[in-house]
Structure formats: structure tokens, C-alpha cells
């Protein structure tokens, strides 16, 4: 697909809030304060390591841009921390949810609809950019990271998560593609795995109709470091694991305490700082 087609499909697909199916599963049926609190409590319990990557307590007074808003859980906590919050999402649904949360909680900030590939902001506007599980869906991960770099002030940092190319899930579900990617990297090539069948994408993201996300990239630490070479520092960390084959004998909580996520976890978190 061409980039404009990917962006259009992303705008349509992600307008259904990421987390909608989960919300229904835990009994969240509206956007009242109590319902959103229930969702948020579940979310942070499921992803406890988010607090290791996002310095919520240090964001007060900072200009913070969040890219990819989902159900607005992270958005609300950023705004509540005292940051000067701005949210950006390519889809209408998440933008509406975050603005609803901000108004409902009497928090300052605003969410706007747009693409990080052509962001509606001036260069060197933000102290922090936070993008959890978003940039790998844009269709151009390299350009998305480059745009973030330009939007950051000197000394600012990009905190983001993308899907890891060598996770246990990729080795199990797409072994040939993963091995081919590994061989390419051994030969010095640095890139993403960006061409994937619908079933591969569906293993990570689907909507309520069972449709997979329009585009998904997977990337290694080495290749991601190259995409972040404009930054002065780059610190990657692997996280996340599911209690699914071959780990179905253990609970997810048990698995998170093992070394498996740090060796071949599903998600690649990184903090890149601009000098």
C-alpha cells in the first residue's frame, strides 16, 4: 500500500479505541469516571513496567506530546502529573476519548487529530514525546522517529514502544521471515519487517470485527538504534509476555518475573535523548 492509503486505513481502523474489546470483557460499558478508573486500574496492573519507562512524577511543567492515544489511560495520567499535555492521534475516536477524559477530570491539555508523519506542530516544541505502541503502525517508522526528533527541544527525549522482531511469538508464528531478517542483519542490513500477512498482524492487533491492523512493523534493537542515530543516546529494553503456548503452564504475573521478557519479549521499549 502507498503511504496515503495506509494513513487513511489507519484513521478508520484505529477510530475504534484500542482496548475496546478488553473494556467489554471487564465490564466497562461507558466512559464515566468510575468505568474509566476500572479500565485504568486494570491497564496499569497488566503493564506494570510502564512506570519504569514513563517518568510520570517528573513531567510537571514539561511540554509533553503523546502520539497514539488508545483508551486514554496514559494520556490522563500524563495530564494529571502536571505536564502541559498535547495528544496526537490519526483517528477521531481516541482524540474524542482523551478530550472527554480531560474535561471530565478538569485537567488542562488537548488532543488533536493528525499524523506524526506530518505533525501540526512547530519544531522544538516538546520536552518529552511518548509513543507507546503507535509508531510501528504508521507505515514509515523511520520518518515517524525523525519527525519526533525534530519536534523535541535540545535535551528532550522520545519514549516509545515498538514490536520486537525476535520475540518468542515471531519465532513461533513466522520462523522463516524471522530467520531471513536475522540473516539480513548478520550481513549488515538494517531495516524493519514491514510486509506481513494479515494473520501475522492479527496476532498483535485486531478490531471487534476481527480485522487486523492495516500496517505493522517489527524491528530489532540494532536496526532501531540506526533509526535513532540522530539522537545522542539510545537505551532499548525488552518487555511483555503472554500466558500462551509455549508458556501456558504459568500465569502472566509469574512469567513477568522471569528473564524471558528481557530476552525475547514481545515489545521493544526505548528512550532516545536529543542533545
PLM region spans:
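A short SAM/SAH-binding and catalytic strip from SAM-dependent methyltransferases
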Residues: 128-139
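A short acidic, Gly/Pro-enriched loop at the edge of an enzyme's catalytic core
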Residues: 117-128
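A short glycine-rich, Lys/Arg-flanked "PGG" loop and its adjoining helix->strand segment in the class I
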Residues: 142-154
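Conserved class I S-adenosyl-L-methionine
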Residues: 157-193
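Class I SAM-dependent methyltransferase SAM/SAH-binding core
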Residues: 63-65, 71-118
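N-terminal, positively charged/glycine-rich alpha-helical extensions of SAM-dependent methyltransferases
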Residues: 1-36
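Conserved alpha-helix/loop element of class I SAM-dependent methyltransferases that forms part
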Residues: 34-62
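A C-terminal cap/extension of S-adenosyl-L-methionine-dependent methyltransferases
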Residues: 180, 186-275
